[in-house]
A protein has these predicted regions:
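Cytosolic regulatory regions built on CNB/CRP/Popeye-like sensor folds
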Residues: 1-165
């Protein structure tokens, strides 16, 4: 029945809003703004060992870990996969993909059974067009996350290279 479907969808949207509150990317959004974002989210569950996406795949969505642990892997020059990041509940990844439409720069694989939300490029573009203030807030949050990631990567890299001077 349509009424039951509407009730399920409404409950799922409320659940998604409750999940979004836990992510720093959305901490500046309130009430109806979170509802608008939730309308563009999709929920997924995957088993341990499952690949979410591979390095080189088309990137058009950002992921938000709700439960479980995701490994981010990068191929080395020898072709081996190296874990470059371990992402637990409350972390997001794939932020660059909704900004630049470039292929994925790494592989994401479930270390444990996991659940996550996604926001795809089309949904994000709709939010930007129809609700520019919400879109700008999300863009600022993505910029903050990417900046933090770059700082961490620079710090880790500095530990492995010799000083030039």
């Amino acid at each position: 029945m349509n009424k039951n479907k509407a009730i399920r969808e409404n409950k799922m949207r409320k659940d998604i809003i409750n999940y979004l509150i836990d992510f720093p990317l959305f901490d500046a959004l309130k009430g109806n703004q979170l509802n608008i974002v939730a309308e563009h989210m999709n929920y997924y569950e995957i088993d341990k060992g499952e690949i979410l996406f591979k390095e080189g795949d088309k990137g058009d969505y950002i992921c938000f870990v709700l439960d479980g642990v995701i490994d981010v892997l990068k191929k080395s020059v020898t072709g081996d996969s190296i874990v470059i990041s371990v992402l637990p509940k409350g972390r997001s990844f794939g932020e660059m993909s909704i900004l630049d439409n470039f292929p994925r720069s790494a592989t994401a694989k479930a270390r444990t059974k996991s659940s996550f939300l996604t926001l795809n490029q089309m949904g994000f573009d709709t939010i930007l067009k129809d609700y520019p203030q919400i879109g700008i807030t999300i863009l600022k949050g993505i910029s903050r996350i990417l900046s933090q990631n770059l700082r961490q990567t620079s710090s880790r890299l500095a530990d492995y290279i010799l000083p030039i001077a």
